[in-house]
């Protein structure tokens, strides 16, 4: 993977006006995008959004450069679709971190991380859970006004939220016996 990444970057630098340089940008994004997926993830059923989002950010940036520089490229529609996926994955990562803080009793850190996810990733599906983390965190901190504000926003945007009924049911990996 590293050598392919270096080759694509070298091609972009050396031949920026080549008629097919858009493919090099696309390839650079794919290399980082596929870095998130491995056989271990598949076998362990690990959620890729629980991993460090560095590769996701790099993939997003590469796809963004492709879309901005070559809006008419044949690779642009796929790059846009992958960018949407990556935004959702990065938002979900922030929510995972917020939940981690909440479980450890760091309620202020949990609320701040959830708030960061909401500000940075406005359209992501993970925002419903981020709002729920904020509601629980502010409640645990005794900040009733902030809790009520977050709950009002959540009810307005997600009136039928699964979090009102205990949250989504998660299927545990085969190796998690307890």
Which ranges hold each PLM region?
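Acidic, polar-rich low-complexity tracts and alpha-helical solenoid repeat scaffolds
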Residues: 1-178
């Amino acid at each position: 993977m590293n050598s392919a990444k270096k080759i694509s970057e070298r091609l972009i630098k050396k031949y920026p006006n080549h008629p097919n340089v858009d493919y090099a940008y696309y390839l650079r994004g794919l290399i980082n995008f596929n870095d998130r997926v491995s056989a271990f993830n598949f076998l362990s059923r690990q959620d890729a959004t629980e991993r460090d989002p560095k590769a996701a950010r790099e993939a997003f940036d590469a796809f963004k450069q492709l879309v901005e520089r070559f809006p008419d490229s044949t690779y642009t529609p796929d790059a846009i679709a992958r960018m949407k996926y990556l935004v959702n994955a990065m938002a979900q990562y922030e929510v995972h971190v917020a939940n981690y803080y909440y479980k450890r009793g760091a309620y202020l850190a949990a609320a701040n991380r959830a708030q960061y996810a909401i500000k940075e990733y406005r359209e992501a599906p993970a925002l419903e859970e981020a709002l729920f983390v904020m509601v629980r965190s502010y409640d645990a901190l005794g900040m009733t006004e902030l809790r009520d504000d977050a709950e009002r926003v959540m009810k307005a945007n997600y009136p039928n939220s699964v979090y009102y009924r205990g949250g989504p049911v998660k299927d545990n990996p085969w190796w998690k016996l307890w």
